[in-house]
């Protein structure tokens, strides 16, 4: 697939997500969380292209959190943002030391790291008056999270494309919800984004998400529709076919 075709495909699915879930309204100030990875770069690049087209009237701002991880170097990232003329701020907060101190060796850091990062993001968005917080999770993240929740937490849940935070002060959006990771990888390579690797997570083996990712990949080899069917299932729920007592009063369920 050519460079333009990949970009066109991704923009199509981002616009579909924006419209299906009314993610962005006229006049919104959208804070895009830029981690330095392929997904967040792709999200920011595509939203910027859509903004420049002019059909969607909104402003974007890139928020970068430097968590003081060893080897972090954002000089190329700064250059890329300056070149694109995208306003941004890089905030330094040492969550790395906290995670290393609290999590025993050999255990996964992702949960605590995410909680700390989320608190900082919410606080910054509120202080700066942003109406939307855009995250770079894509289709594969959503379906992997679904299986992870079932397998390891005993819950049927995932990542919604649009979410009101628990404190009801922030609206989170995931414009890449329909986009496949393989297309994002191609796009990121073509755009030559100056990626910043996450040394904290990348050094850990056998993460749950990687195992679930391999499982879905293996199933897709037998039936290519498996990933798309899983995504479709997230918006095609049949509550009467489940066994949640909060949805149905099973004890009183009888024929009239």
UniProtKB/Swiss-Prot annotation:
Recorded GO MF terms: 4 iron, 4 sulfur cluster binding; ATP binding; magnesium ion binding; sulfurtransferase activity; tRNA binding
Main location: cytoplasm
Pathway(s) where this gene product acts: tRNA modification
Annotated InterPro entries: Rossmann-like_a/b/a_fold, TilS/TtcA_N, tRNA_Cyd_32_2_STrfase, tRNA_thiolation_TtcA_Ctu1
Gene3D superfamilies for the chain: HUPs (3.40.50.620)
Record keywords: 4Fe-4S, ATP-binding, Cytoplasm, Iron, Iron-sulfur, Magnesium, Metal-binding, Nucleotide-binding, RNA-binding, Transferase, tRNA processing, tRNA-binding
Root EC class: transferase
Subunit structure: Homodimer.
Additional record remark: The thiolation reaction likely consists of two steps: a first activation step by ATP to form an adenylated intermediate of the target base of tRNA, and a second nucleophilic substitution step of the sulfur (S) atom supplied by the hydrosulfide attached to the Fe-S cluster.
Protein name per its UniProtKB record: tRNA-cytidine(32) 2-sulfurtransferase
């Amino acid at each position: 697939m050519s460079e333009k075709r990949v970009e066109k495909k991704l923009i199509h699915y981002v616009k579909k997500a924006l419209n299906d879930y009314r993610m962005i309204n006229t006049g919104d100030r959208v804070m895009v969380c830029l981690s330095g990875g392929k997904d967040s770069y792709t999200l920011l690049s595509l939203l910027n292209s859509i903004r420049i087209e002019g059909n969607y009237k909104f402003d974007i701002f890139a928020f970068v959190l430097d968590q003081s991880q060893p080897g972090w170097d954002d000089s190329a990232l700064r250059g890329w943002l300056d070149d694109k003329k995208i306003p941004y701020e890089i905030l330094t907060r040492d969550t790395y030391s906290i995670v290393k101190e609290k999590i025993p060796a050999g255990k996964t850091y992702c949960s605590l790291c995410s909680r700390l990062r989320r608190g900082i993001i919410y606080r910054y968005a509120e202080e700066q008056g942003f109406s939307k917080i855009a995250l770079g999770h894509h289709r594969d993240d959503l379906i992997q999270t679904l299986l992870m929740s079932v397998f390891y937490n005993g819950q049927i849940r995932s990542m919604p494309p649009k979410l009101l935070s628990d404190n009801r002060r922030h609206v989170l959006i995931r414009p890449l919800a329909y986009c496949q990771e393989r297309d994002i990888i191609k796009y990121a390579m073509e755009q030559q984004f100056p990626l910043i690797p996450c040394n904290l997570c990348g050094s850990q083996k056998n993460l749950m998400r990687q195992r679930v990712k391999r499982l879905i990949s293996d199933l897709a080899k037998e039936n290519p529709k498996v990933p798309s069917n899983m995504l479709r299932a997230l918006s095609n729920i049949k509550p009467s076919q489940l066994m949640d007592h909060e949805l149905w009063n099973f004890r009183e369920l009888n024929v009239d």
